[in-house]
Regions:
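C-terminal intrinsically disordered, low-complexity extensions immediately downstream
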Residues: 400-425
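Glycine-rich ATP phosphate-binding loop
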Residues: 69-74, 78-89
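Conserved catalytic-loop aspartate of Hanks-type protein kinases
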Residues: 239
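Activation segment signature within eukaryotic-like protein kinase domains
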Residues: 163-164
Length: 425
């Protein structure tokens, strides 16, 4: 050892240089504890927390985002390995994370016990040098990582069905207590353990109560609903749109609607599902993307003639000229734009499958297409609820005859249509 060569050398473990885990570890704010973007500068073997039963030894970094960082830690009292979310010392991040903690506690208190297994547990929360720390059970890979590990090839229908049913159960629970997640995506759905397909929904930082909408700009773009893009007041149905996009991505291995901007996201929706109904076009935000025109077939005395006005999506050239932009046509991931074709002609799970196996696969795909059309209805008034979707043959595995409609009455849920409150019944 070094002390044998230099006997007078006094080695002290405490003087070892610490390995920084935070990407930008240059001290800038908060007495040198924070970097320039107000992230707490984390090092291996740091101790988070000061109270005796709330001390956590930092082991490794798990992730970093706009809210802050997630680190793998060990509870020094119980020896349990946990995930600690260390929030940035910025007011907007702090407020959003306090709200997340409140939502998780509300879910734990209000949700039916049979649904609790689908949500991440908030084990502890505390302040550390002006940073809010949220402590969670350490989970495994998220669904995006599962897709990536599969080389962006789709998962088998059996596993897609298993995952879809669990997410729907979680959405049933949220709908019953009138909570909207507002950021459902593959990254926010995690396996509890790597060797079991049990899922948990995480990241309630954007969540809100139905009828108390906190933000107009919600949902990650690929999973953003048409009503959010068009500025219509939204409900729990936005989570069902995100759910449909996730299920399609699990099967296809790639995002169904990978828009590069809000305009392009809406354009992809229109290509795949058609134009949204006219009542969704009345908000000011919609005028950024659509052109209003007189409806030549309008008849005041004939309800079936349509409204006084009709709408069409602006062309890319029109949109670029109006806003002085230079957006170019986006890359197409699939060889068709219609949902039926995208799903039905997607690669088979195995080469040289027997004819009867191919027939069974195509029959199941037909059922999947029908299911996706119900949860991805472009009108939130007609989109299926999680309770309805759970009864679809794709989930129940009942014989698929080619036709199905939700057998139950709609749960009441207010939504605004051009300033008037409607009830989904």
């Amino acid at each position: 050892s070094y002390s044998m060569c230099v006997p007078e050398y006094d080695y002290q473990k405490s003087k070892n240089p610490r390995r920084a885990l935070t990407k930008n570890s240059k001290p800038c704010h908060n007495g040198g504890y924070d970097n320039e973007v107000y992230d707490y500068i984390l090092y291996v073997n740091d101790i988070l927390g000061t109270e005796e039963n709330k001390k956590y030894l930092v082991l490794d970094i798990l992730g970093q985002g706009t809210f802050g960082q997630v680190v793998k830690c060990q509870n020094l009292k119980t020896q349990e390995i946990v995930a600690v979310k260390v929030i940035k010392a910025r007011q907007e991040c702090l407020q959003q994370s306090i709200a997340e903690g409140n939502v998780l506690e509300y879910i734990d208190k209000k949700v039916d016990p049979k649904y609790k297994k689908y949500f991440i547990d908030l084990k502890d929360k505390f302040m550390h040098k002006y940073h809010l720390c949220l402590v969670f059970k350490l989970l495994s890979s998220n669904l995006y990582e599962i897709i990536k590990q599969n080389h962006h090839h789709g998962l088998c229908i059996k596993l897609v069905r298993n995952f879809a049913a669990q997410i729907l159960e979680a959405l049933c629970a949220l709908k019953e207590i009138k909570i909207i997640h507002c950021d459902l995506k593959p990254e926010n759905i995690l396996l509890a353990k790597l060797n079991k397909p049990d899922l948990k929904v995480i990241d309630f930082g954007s969540a809100c109560e139905e009828h108390q909408l906190l933000y107009s700009y919600v949902q990650s773009r690929f999973y953003r609903s048409p009503e959010v893009i068009l500025g219509v007041d939204y409900s729990t149905s936005v989570d069902m749109w995100s759910f449909g996009c996730i299920v399609a991505e699990l099967f296809l291995g790639l995002p169904l609607l990978p828009g590069t901007s809000e305009y392009e996201q809406l354009a992809r929706m229109v290509q795949t599902f058609g134009m949204p109904p006219s009542w969704m076009m009345v908000e000011k935000k919609a005028s950024n993307y659509v052109v209003k025109q007189d409806n030549p077939s309008y008849d005041y005395f004939n309800d079936k003639s349509g409204g006084r006005y009709s709408y069409r999506l602006k062309t890319l050239d029109e949109f670029n000229r109006e806003f002085n932009l230079h957006e170019s046509p986006a890359k197409q991931y699939f060889c068709d734009t219609k949902l039926d074709k995208i799903v039905m002609i997607y690669r088979l799970p195995k080469k040289n499958m027997p004819r009867d196996a191919v027939d069974r696969e195509m029959h199941e795909r037909s059922c999947l297409v029908h299911f996706l059309k119900g949860v991805l209805n472009i009108s939130p008034l007609e989109r299926w609820t999680p309770q309805e979707a759970l009864q679809h043959p794709f989930i129940t595995e009942e014989p698929w005859t080619g036709h199905w409609a939700p057998p139950t009455a709609r749960f009441s849920s207010d939504i605004r249509r051009g300033g008037r409150s409607l009830s989904l019944v």
